[in-house]
Regions:
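Conserved catalytic block of serine-dependent lipid acyl chemistry
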Residues: 21, 112-215, 232-239
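Alpha-helical membrane-targeting segments
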Residues: 52-71, 173-196, 254, 258-274
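Short active-site oxyanion
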Residues: 11-14, 105-106, 137-138
Length: 307
């Protein structure tokens, strides 16, 4: 999606991200150009499940023995450190805001402070990864509070928002295998339902352009083996949407809600679940759209600095 938006000369005034989308947003904020997007694609094409979710026999035993989390975040930390060039959020070439959730369920927006800690907090899937202590908060995955960037982007002053949904496995024929796979699937479904809610809540107050997600889709977010296929399919899908005037006509909120609700109905009863992240492109008072990847209701947003 980012590749095709860049080809269409879409630029960003700010970036807001949650969960894995926060990592994509931070990477883009550090290299908001075609070369940066190409490198981001190469990162995703080269990832394997063990690079992010290194579940071992020892970790399973520890979890069964009372450990707080199943996965050691060291691999994820190294991945972030290796690929995100700015040490603090405020150092990014484009303003970037990372959304996480505190243990009370409130959404917390991190706009400054250590980048790695903020991204680890936003992607800290409960039970899978440990919570991250930042300031006065113990933070977990931003998707737990709200995972669509729409409301946060509007709260940050965006008047034009382009939503890049991660989508979800809407055509699985059986439940994902394994606890982590099911948790990820559950989170992706939650994002989709939150998007429907947020579109309704926004109610046409800003211009929202939602790139249609791939559906039917039968790939679990725990399956990294088909990254090449999904990247190219999504690029083609986005290109057709742009060529059809998608960037020139803001979507009617109720039409977007209806389209997403129809997509959700693809889900067989057996596939209950959800997770991952979605960047959005937003826009302030200038004429060009803005990339925003966030997820929180304005009433729940609690800005803090990551100290």
């Amino acid at each position: 999606m980012l590749r095709e938006l860049m080809h269409a000369r879409v630029s960003a005034d700010l970036v807001v991200g949650s969960s894995v989308g926060a990592m994509n947003a931070a990477y883009f904020a550090g290299a908001p150009n075609a070369a940066g997007i190409d490198k981001l694609e190469k990162v995703w094409r080269g990832l394997r499940r063990h690079d992010v979710f290194p579940v071992t026999f020892r970790s399973v035993l520890g979890f069964m023995g009372g450990a707080d989390n199943l996965i050691d975040p060291s691999n994820l930390r190294r991945l972030i450190e290796h690929n995100i060039p700015f040490p603090n959020l405020e150092d990014a070439p484009i303003p970037v805001h990372v959304v996480a959730t505190n243990l009370g369920g409130a959404t917390v927006c991190l706009s400054s402070g250590p980048t790695v800690e903020a991204l680890l907090a936003s992607a800290a899937i409960p039970a899978a990864f440990p919570s991250v202590h930042i300031g006065e908060h113990h933070l977990i995955d931003g998707a737990v509070g709200s995972n669509t960037p729409i409301l946060n982007a509007a709260d940050l002053g965006a008047t034009r928002i382009i939503v890049l949904p991660t989508g979800f496995a809407c055509a699985l024929h059986e439940p994902p295998k394994g606890a982590i796979a099911r948790a990820l699937h559950a989170l992706t479904l939650l994002i989709a339902h939150q998007m429907v809610r947020d579109l309704r809540q926004l109610g046409g107050k800003v211009d929202v352009f939602t790139i249609p997600n791939l559906c039917p889709l039968d790939v679990s977010p725990y399956d990294f083996s088909r990254a090449d296929q999904l990247i190219e399919q999504t690029a083609g899908h986005t290109r057709k949407w742009i060529e059809g005037g998608g960037l020139s006509r803001p979507g009617d909120p109720e039409f977007s809600v209806a389209a997403y609700t129809l997509t959700l109905r693809w889900l067989p009863r057996v596939t209950l679940g959800r997770k991952y992240d979605s960047p959005a492109i937003a826009k302030t008072n200038n004429e060009e759209p803005v990339l925003a990847d966030t997820d929180a209701e304005s009433s729940n947003l609690e800005p803090i600095n990551a100290m």
